[in-house]
């Protein structure tokens, strides 16, 4: 992000990033392993994707700080996903993906992850689950020179 931000600022261009995941996830109903699984997913998102370590859930706050440091006017706002039982396909894809990331990171045992995933899928199949996934939109623009 630093190289992109430096180039944008050097050209005095505006910058907009939509739906930057910020690490906030809440489940209804909750499960004792939610925080551990989501923590593992956040660690997974920070892994090197071929360009060095990724920012993962820190991307929005780092982007805000970077543009403020170069004198840009920055506006940001929550743009959370709120997924309800009728969003079942998306909910299933999310919990499956989070479980997969947790398995790759290896901070929890495979039986713990399987138990968490079974609990989440069961709640989804009975339409008793909703999830809020925190995102932030960021707009940055150079302050006009006089």
Kindly label every feature range from the protein language model.
Residues 1-2, 27:
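Short glycine-/acidic-enriched loop or helix-start segments at secondary-structure transitions
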Residues 2-16:
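A short glycine-rich, Lys/Arg-flanked "PGG" loop and its adjoining helix->strand segment in the class I
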Residues 3, 58-62, 135:
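Short, well-structured alpha-helical interface segments that form or flank functional binding sites
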Residues 6-9, 29-37, 87-95:
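Short, surface-exposed, charged loop/turn segments at secondary-structure junctions
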Residues 7-8, 65, 129-130:
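A general structural signal for short secondary-structure junctions and capping/turn motifs
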Residues 13-78:
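Conserved catalytic/acceptor-binding region of the Class I
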Residues 70-146:
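Conserved Class I S-adenosyl-L-methionine
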